[in-house]
Amino acid sequence: KNKINKIVEFGAGLGRDSVFFAKNLIHTIALDYSKAGISIIDQKIKKQNLTKYLSTKLFDVRKKLPFKDNSVEACYSHMLYCMALNNQDLQNLNDEILRILKPGGINIYTVRHTDDGDYENGIFRGEDLYENDGFIVHYFSKEKIYSLLNGFSNILIENFDEGSFPRKLFYVANMKNVINQ
């Protein structure tokens, strides 16, 4: 709808969504913390001849994002915000996304929410973080989503289910304000 030509995916994992974007002729930069994940995406790029539309970068999103100010049309992440990131990490990431997005740019992300069946199960690690089977998940309320809107306008928050459990998620779309403070 917004005719996005270039997108950055944070927490690309094994590249499912990055490959989808590239196959739909959207120039995609896939960032992930895992060398193994990046290696798998690189193999998919070669095997599926996607070098024109998809590139990768090994990167920790807790650091300053490797892009110039106001240079990116759209950012996307599927459950990255649910990783073991505390509220300050999330605010820093969101501030960095705000910095790199062009005015009117879109940040789309998905998060597990507080109606999820695993919420409040396992070991409480603070800030709506729960550890289950050695894996920490950060759960979101709508209030937490709204708290990350500084410099953004919310376009959409939509509930959806994923998997057979199913996981309960929010799909969030925010637009960078054209004029920021």
Label for each model-derived stretch:
Residues 1-54, 58-63, 92, 107-177, ...:
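Class I (Rossmann-like) S-adenosyl-L-methionine-dependent methyltransferase catalytic domain
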Residues 62-75:
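A short acidic, Gly/Pro-enriched loop at the edge of an enzyme's catalytic core
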Residues 65, 94-99:
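Short amphipathic alpha-helices and their capping/turn segments at secondary-structure boundaries
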Residues 65-66, 84-85, 149:
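Activation segment
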Residues 77-80:
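A short beta-strand submotif of the Rossmann-like class I SAM-dependent methyltransferase core
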Residues 83-84, 116:
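Short glycine-rich, flexible loops that bind phosphorylated cofactors or substrates
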Residues 84-96:
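A short, conserved alpha-helix within the catalytic core of class I
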Residues 101-106:
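Short glycine-dipeptide loop
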